[in-house]
Amino acid sequence: MDVNQLILLLKSKIKKNILIQNITIKDKTYLHKKHISHTEGKFHLELSIKSEELKKYNKIQATKRIYNILDEEIKQYIHSVQILIN
């Protein structure tokens, strides 16, 4: 799966499970290409989510919700993910 397909899939899954006002996903893989731990086909992503629903939870609870929704994709395609909740 290429990164653009992955981003569309992640947005779709999050929107189906959480009421959000806005979501932006950035590919930060280029920052890690020369690292020893870099694996081709595994991406470094930054998720910025504006959600009144997620703001009701503390940071750990909100992050767990996102991780649970994206569990399969994290295991297969994501090396690291940074989650920003606004």
Q: What feature does the model see in each segment?
A:
Residues 1-86:
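N-terminal, polar/charged subdomain of small-to-medium soluble alpha/beta proteins
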